[in-house]
């Protein structure tokens, strides 16, 4: 099954994304990203990650590319289309497309990319649940 990503309004196979060459994220790393763990089909600490993403966007003056309800629906659809159970969701939001220059015009439309990665169950659970240890004297 091909991996599917959400790229600027459409779902595409991950090996054929359409990112504009003059996207400021590509040219200047002008954007933010967030990675959210997925366990048993559930995004872990989703509100924490969305708050941090919101704060990061606000700090560099990038508008949210979509409404929160639509954003959550896109995340759920990427998980569904990729049949993800355990893994992570990668979210990248850039300032958008503009002619290559250090300054940028106001009102750019932000770019949004979301894709998921499958991983083994215990990789995420170890990070989330921790591991049990017993300490002994040397």
What does each of the following model-derived ranges do?
Residues 1-138:
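Conserved alpha/beta cores of soluble small-molecule-handling proteins
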